[in-house]
């Protein structure tokens, strides 16, 4: 897992006084903004709001691939799959704070919501990672555990992250191949 990138840009969310004005102004510059960003980097990740405002809707409709972060929560999963059917074909799902012994495990989620196994990955719950996030030490946690086989919990966590990254990478390559064919 390459942890440092040559070109990694982050456009932070800011306090927006008037969402309607933001959405209007974003639409005016959206196409130019994304063209510039795509010229600067091979991959472009955009973190959107989970609501259906204009900027989120336009970003999702233009996206080649959408990574959807979910939890093992029956109500949340059902609500998502009932209310967002349009993005399913473009989606790669990540189940965060995953617990394999939970009632809604990976197999059940895939079966219930008709998700092909290659379109879903898990990020297991890990207390040590949670502490690293709290203290701003995620990179150190990952670097320390990337090859470590001593700590069983961290080894399981890293295997699952590796698997999720590999599945996501395959989806990205598939999207790039489809784009090249056009």
Q: Can you name each region flagged by the protein language model?
A:
Residues 99, 104, 108-152:
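Beta-strand-loop-alpha "switch" segments that mediate conformational coupling across diverse proteins
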Residues 33, 55, 76:
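Short acidic active-site motifs
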Residues 22-31, 80-102:
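P-loop/Walker A phosphate-binding loop and immediately adjacent motor/lid segment at beta-alpha junctions
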Residues 139-182:
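NTP-binding/hydrolysis catalytic cores, primarily Walker-type P-loop NTPases
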Residues 12-13, 45-47, 66-71, 93-97, ...:
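Conserved beta-strand segments of the P-loop GTPase G domain that flank and frequently precede/overlap
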Residues 5, 41, 62-64, 88, ...:
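Short, well-ordered alpha-helix to beta-strand connector turns
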Residues 1-39:
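P-loop/Walker-type NTP enzyme "switch/lid" segment
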Residues 50-73:
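Inter-motif core of Ras-like GTPase G domains
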């Amino acid at each position: 897992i390459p942890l440092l990138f040559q070109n990694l840009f982050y456009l932070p969310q800011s306090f927006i006084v008037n969402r309607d004005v933001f959405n209007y102004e974003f639409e005016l510059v959206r196409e130019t903004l994304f063209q510039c960003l795509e010229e600067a980097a091979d991959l472009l990740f955009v973190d959107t709001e989970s609501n259906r405002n204009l900027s989120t809707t336009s970003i999702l409709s233009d996206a080649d691939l959408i990574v959807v972060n979910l939890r093992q929560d029956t109500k949340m999963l059902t609500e998502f799959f009932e209310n967002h059917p349009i993005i399913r074909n473009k989606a790669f799902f990540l189940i965060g704070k995953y617990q394999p012994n939970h009632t809604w495990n990976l197999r059940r989620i895939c079966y219930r919501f008709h998700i092909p196994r290659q379109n879903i990955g898990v990020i297991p719950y890990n207390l040590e990672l949670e502490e690293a996030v709290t203290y701003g030490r995620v990179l150190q946690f990952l670097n320390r555990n990337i090859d470590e086989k001593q700590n069983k919990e961290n080894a399981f966590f890293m295997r699952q992250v590796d698997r999720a990254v590999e599945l996501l990478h395959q989806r990205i390559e598939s999207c790039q191949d489809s784009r090249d064919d056009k």
